[in-house]
Amino acid sequence: MAVPKKRTSKSRKRIRNNFWKKEKNDRIASRVFSLAQSILTGRSKSFYYAIRDKLPNSSE
């Protein structure tokens, strides 16, 4: 005779779900860090940004 399995608790479900989210976020963070490095070193060819010489309203 078949016996129903115990139901997975909400906390267990949340732990397992967060594990997958963490892995995805780590990958995204790695890409963002790589892009930031290429911008700071001047090697970025696909990202355009404006460079300001002086900040407006500076006290110096």
UniProtKB/Swiss-Prot annotation:
It comes from Psilotum nudum (Whisk fern). It is found in: Plastid, Chloroplast. Belongs to the bacterial ribosomal protein bL32 family. It comes from the Eukaryota. InterPro entries: Ribosomal_bL32 (IPR002677), Ribosomal_bL32_plant/cyanobact (IPR044958), Ribosomal_zn-bd (IPR011332). Pfam families: Ribosomal_L32p. Keywords: Chloroplast, Plastid, Ribonucleoprotein, Ribosomal protein. GO terms for biological process: translation. GO terms for cellular component: chloroplast; large ribosomal subunit. PANTHER family: 50S RIBOSOMAL PROTEIN L32, CHLOROPLASTIC (PTHR36083), LARGE RIBOSOMAL SUBUNIT PROTEIN BL32C (PTHR36083:SF1). GO terms for molecular function: structural constituent of ribosome. This is Large ribosomal subunit protein bL32c.
